[in-house]
Amino acid sequence: IREPHFFHGKNAFTYFIPKTFDYFLQAKKLGMTFKAPKPDPINQNMLTGKISNKQPFIFDLCHLGQSMCKKNLGIEFAYEISNSIFGGKKDWYKDNHLFSICSKLGVDLEEMRNFTKLNEKEIIREIENNQIEQLAIGHHGVPLTVYKNNFFFGQDRFDNLIDELRKDGLKYN
């Protein structure tokens, strides 16, 4: 979405199928379920890589996620919604699924939507600033964590991030 030119020349055979297979293998290694999202949060033609101008899910999802960050529930929300999206939950975006996730986190979906709407400009500005900071560190992919000017992209480097945090005193089981 942010970098549509990234997908120029990529297609199902040269990019999407190998990436999906890699995601599946990584999930299997971690004992996690991985299934193709139904629907995918990003509306994109997997044969051509072209990103659609119509995006019914990703912006609301990102705004809700940023709102959860403001409530100190960002990681928990990301965990729950990712498991829903990539764990085979059909129609993950529908209210019954989102209500369930919010309830598990101890928040009300409607209150979060109202909070998001009231703070939309600030939330968008925060997301844009995050994108600027990602590019400044030398990466634009997601999920991405930056710690001490080093980026940790995707699930493959999560253990490296935890090791760095532990060196600095993080207590983590």
Protein language model features and the residues they cover:
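Structural alpha/beta surface segment adjacent to cysteine/selenocysteine redox centers
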Residues: 1-85, 172
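C-terminal cap of thioredoxin/glutaredoxin-like
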Residues: 76-173
